[in-house]
Amino acid sequence: MKIKVRNRLLMTKGVIAARREAGQADHYSWVWVLPLRSGEFRVAAIEVPKDLIDNDECFFEDDMTRPYVKIVDSVDDVDHAVREAGVDPETLDAPWYSDFPL
């Protein structure tokens, strides 16, 4: 991952995200990384129906699917988990660069 993205995770404890190929044609998908209070990192892929995003509708937990979720111990393990989820770690950035909806 890029240094600025690594710094976002470690210094500001901010979320990072990247678009990924959705498993369903009528869904959009992202991988996001969330720093946890424990010092670990949650790496998750989510898929959301396109119509909810395109129509700017509110959606909830039940509207999303999570084809991948993993907790990793350190920032050094994030790249591997992100690859497992189907994304190149170099594409990770602040959520607004990938239109991450959460």
Across the structure, where does each feature detected by a protein language model lie?
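Negatively charged, low-complexity tracts enriched in Asp/Glu with abundant Ser/Thr
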Residues: 1-28
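Short, charged low-complexity linear motifs
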Residues: 26-33, 82-83
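Mixed-charge, Lys/Arg-enriched low-complexity segments
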Residues: 1-7, 52-102
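Generic detector of low-complexity/intrinsically disordered segments
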Residues: 11-12, 36-38, 94
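A short, structured beta-strand/loop element
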Residues: 31-60
